[in-house]
């Protein structure tokens, strides 16, 4: 895709799905990308980014906290500020998915010929009616998260990000319109520590090559880019590819990079709605009734930040930095990490190296048993006598079996708690379409 700020990597491997635990210790199913895989910045506010993790599913609410889980009712009736607050409440690194992140996924799909279909016709795809999801009572045509076929995922496989086209509109952060002027928090800054309030100084205009701010003029059924403030205000919608540009300017490439103007050669029936009066936040994707007008690059800029309705929800994302620990569920923001304990045991000889390897295996068992001092335990293991090692080897097999049983018990308990909390029973075959 020639208009991208960085070259997005074409599909070379299966999407990486990970379970990430928030500060409450509850799991989210996320799809994880390196910055280069999506063409996103590798630095946020002077911190090096290791990975971006995107909610695989439109979020549901459990005890007032958003989670990315399959076969759940998507959370709706959430206004823009509340969506931001809920996502950030999950802990360090968590945020409302930004427009930069959303559009990067869209460009990835376009570049790899996997533009997703979705629930655009009350439980099914308008263009492929054989593609259906699971509707639910009171949903008015909405489907449970991730209940559609793989064609509803951004990469066309079971491992992709689900439901970016249709089902419910989704809030995105880091972009807005102010009296028809598009404004952004640049360089994906809304992903970490940004002030996205109405009066925030972080909002920036987008400029033409001549240095004039860009405005969208909504008038007489058309939406036209121009370098001056519109004379009046209006509300309307047009096909995304039918956005016009006044003859005395060119559409800035930055607008294309942000999915605010169609990239060269892009073709689609997706719609672009805008109200040029006052501040307007952005929704993406369309809903279950938008038909051909829905899609990844579909946009609505018609409502205030306080507006909430049953057709609009959201999904969280999180960012992990280079200095964070190697576990995805640790999103500690401290730049200064504690120095690791130095190992005083050296094993230059053959027998010593074998003991060192045994110590590492015993240390893993110790950590699995929730030991509080794995480094200290490893030193004890390396200093152990042959007789102690022989006894430990016999006991370790029993300990491993106990750990496996405990893990299975904990997993079962989580599943039972989740089922009790949501009161949703997942069946192998569901014919509950409205």
Where is each model-derived feature located?
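C-terminal, surface-exposed recognition/capping segments
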Residues: 2-4, 15-18, 134-140, 147, ...
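Extracellular adhesion/carbohydrate-recognition regions
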Residues: 12, 16-93, 179-224, 280, ...
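Charged, low-complexity interaction regions
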Residues: 369-378, 386, 398-402
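Amphipathic, non-membrane alpha-helical rod segments
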Residues: 384-388, 392
């Amino acid at each position: 895709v020639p208009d991208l700020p960085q070259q997005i990597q074409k599909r070379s491997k299966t999407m990486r799905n990970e379970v990430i635990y928030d500060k409450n210790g509850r799991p989210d199913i996320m799809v994880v990308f390196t910055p280069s895989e999506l063409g996103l910045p590798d630095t946020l506010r002077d911190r090096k980014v290791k990975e971006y993790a995107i909610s695989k599913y439109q979020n549901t609410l459990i005890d007032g906290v958003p989670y990315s889980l399959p076969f759940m009712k998507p959370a709706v009736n959430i206004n823009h500020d509340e969506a931001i607050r809920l996502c950030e409440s999950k802990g360090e690194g968590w945020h409302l998915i930004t427009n930069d992140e959303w559009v990067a996924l869209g460009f990835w799909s376009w570049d790899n010929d996997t533009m997703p279909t979705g629930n655009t016709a009350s439980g099914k795809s308008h263009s492929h009616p054989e593609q259906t999801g699971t509707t639910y009572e009171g949903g008015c045509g909405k489907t449970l998260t991730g209940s559609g076929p793989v064609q509803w995922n951004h990469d066309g496989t079971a491992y992709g990000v689900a439901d970016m086209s249709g089902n419910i509109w989704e809030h995105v952060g880091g972009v807005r319109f102010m009296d028809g002027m598009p404004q952004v928090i640049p360089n994906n800054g809304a992903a970490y520590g940004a002030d996205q309030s109405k009066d925030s100084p972080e909002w920036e205009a987008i400029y033409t090559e001549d240095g004039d701010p860009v405005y969208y003029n909504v008038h007489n059924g058309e939406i036209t880019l121009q370098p001056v403030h519109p004379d009046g205000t209006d509300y309307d919608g047009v096909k995304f590819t039918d956005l016009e540009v006044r003859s005395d300017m060119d559409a800035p490439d930055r607008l294309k990079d942000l999915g605010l103007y169609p990239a060269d050669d892009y073709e689609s029936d997706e719609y672009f709605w805008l109200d040029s009066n006052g501040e307007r936040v952005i929704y993406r994707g369309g809903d279950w009734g938008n038909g051909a007008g829905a899609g990844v690059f579909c946009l609505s800029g018609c409502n205030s930040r306080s507006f909430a309705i049953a057709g609009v929800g959201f999904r969280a994302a999180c960012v992990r930095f280079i200095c964070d620990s190697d576990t995805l569920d640790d999103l500690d923001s401290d730049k200064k990490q504690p120095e690791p304990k130095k190992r005083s045991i050296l094993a230059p000889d053959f027998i010593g190296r074998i003991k060192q390897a045994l110590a590492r295996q015993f240390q893993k068992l110790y950590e699995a048993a929730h030991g509080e001092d794995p480094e200290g335990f490893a030193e004890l293991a390396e200093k152990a006598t042959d007789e102690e090692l022989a006894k430990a080897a016999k006991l370790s097999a029993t300990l491993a079996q106990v750990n496996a049983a405990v893990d299975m018990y904990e997993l079962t308990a989580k599943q039972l708690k989740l089922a009790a909390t949501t009161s949703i029973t997942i069946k192998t075959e569901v014919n509950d379409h409205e």
